[in-house]
């Protein structure tokens, strides 16, 4: 009896059985990659996928983003049926595209269309990093260019939410050409007095950051978003210097004058509404033929 009182405590934790793990369905809980807090996924979704503990902005898919900024039921999609081919016959590219279509229920890495924010009509494009890491191929570039042209025709503002790893390597020079095509479309829109708001989310890199993402009349970003062209390691090896810890973050770019504002997701719709309201009937709304 007395001997039982002095038995050494076990120094290990019991690992739950496979059956116990199966009792918690997939998707019920989400772990924050920043603070490691585990929370109910429903709670996270209710908070616009912003961690309730540390404020980390989890990635949003295209439909979640549209729901968070547009008036309910106002969105009308453009060019839904456009799909990428494999013009360079890159190995396994078609299989990867098909896999992403099934996984995301999207045909490509961007969703474009029109909708309203507080009854103000806008054309909007939202990139979805779940599809080929949001990379820009021929179809992504074409859909964005068409959306800008639609904004030009309707004489309404164009808003884009970027989330991309850059140009799509499987399409080579055809992918790089989209940088010029989208930029030219935006120049035409701008010359006519059209308003363009670019919102950079995590991550916005490569050819996307070096083209249309940085051309906004207003360049906004979400907190903590990674924004840059080349990767940190490549830059450090090139300049042979250690870069600041916050290098290529939205906050770093704001401090160095490359962004107009870093906007919390809770405030994004209201911030866009205010910008649109300021330009209603103003100089930017005077269109030139």
From Swiss-Prot:
NCBIfam families associated with the record: accD
Q: Which HAMAP family match?
A: AcetylCoA_CT_beta
As for what it does, the entry says: Component of the acetyl coenzyme A carboxylase (ACC) complex. Biotin carboxylase (BC) catalyzes the carboxylation of biotin on its carrier protein (BCCP) and then the CO(2) group is transferred by the transcarboxylase to acetyl-CoA to form malonyl-CoA.
Cite the residue ranges of zinc fingers (C4-type).
32-54
**Coding gene?**
accD
Name the record gives this protein = Acetyl-coenzyme A carboxylase carboxyl transferase subunit beta
Q: Name the cofactor(s).
A: Zn(2+)
Would I find Signal among this entry's keywords? no
Organism of origin: Bacillus cereus (strain AH187)
* Gene3D superfamilies associated with the record: 2-enoyl-CoA Hydratase, Chain A, domain 1
Catalysed reaction(s) here are: N(6)-carboxybiotinyl-L-lysyl-[protein] + acetyl-CoA = N(6)-biotinyl-L-lysyl-[protein] + malonyl-CoA
User: What's noted on cofactor binding?
Assistant: Binds 1 zinc ion per subunit.
